[in-house]
From Swiss-Prot:
Homodimer. Forms a heterodimer with renin and inhibits its activity. This is N-acylglucosamine 2-epimerase. Pathway: Amino-sugar metabolism; N-acetylneuraminate degradation. One of its GO terms (biological process) is N-acetylneuraminate catabolic process. It catalyses: an N-acyl-D-glucosamine = an N-acyl-D-mannosamine. Keywords: Isomerase. Belongs to the N-acylglucosamine 2-epimerase family. The keyword Isomerase applies. It comes from the Eukaryota. The gene is RENBP. GO terms for molecular function: identical protein binding; N-acylglucosamine 2-epimerase activity; peptidase inhibitor activity. The keyword Oxidoreductase does not apply.
């Protein structure tokens, strides 16, 4: 059960990291398009 809980927490952290990366990429693309 501990391993499952740890994996669940890790997945949430990864999801948040990927969400931030997605926002960063989107901003870079928008800036490039505006130029």
């Amino acid at each position: 059960l501990n391993l499952v809980d740890q994996l669940g927490e890790a997945d949430e952290e990864l999801a948040g990291t990927y969400a931030e990366l997605g926002d960063w990429c989107a901003q870079r693309i928008l800036q490039h398009v505006q130029r």
